[in-house]
Amino acid sequence: MLYICIPNNVWYIMSKKILLSSKEIHIILHRLACQLIENHTDFENTVLIGIQPRGTYLAERLVSILENDYQIPSVKLGLLDITFYRDDFRRRDTPLEANKTNINFIVEDKKVVFIDDVLFSGRSIRAALTAIQSFGRPSEIELLVLIDRRFSRHLPIQPNYRGSQVDVFDEEKVSVHWQERDGKDAVYIVNK
């Protein structure tokens, strides 16, 4: 348990439960890579798009696995910032910080696989669907997520590929930690 003090000396107890360990994430990433290979074979007509900010770690890791462990050469990877396409970006008290979009290929008539860490309400994916149209009209769009919070949807969006499904209360948050950013791979359920 973690105790947090906020102003006026009010203490809150924050609990953190591990959902996936580093080893479990490793196994899931290889399974997801194999599922992508089954459906996209050589990736000749497929591009992967990591949704900024946290989906990029998952996307980069999957590309590394595809290229290094399964010898799929030159998998096309783009990074998509959806900040100004979100339907809630003007409703926040603090301004949102935009990330970088880096898509240096044409998505016209390509199969696009959106990649994000957690599917929650579906609003990020709706924003990504709008944002990708600036880069062309894909022939097909699929969704890959590490964690699917299945009973939390606000929009009718479902993943084509999921690492794990979890049912958590609304007051709980799924927190994905990546080695590259957080020092280790793990997924936690945290009480807000």
Across the structure, where does each feature detected by a protein language model lie?
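Charged, well-structured alpha/beta interaction segments
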Residues: 43-64, 122
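PRPP-dependent phosphoribosyltransferase catalytic core
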Residues: 130-192
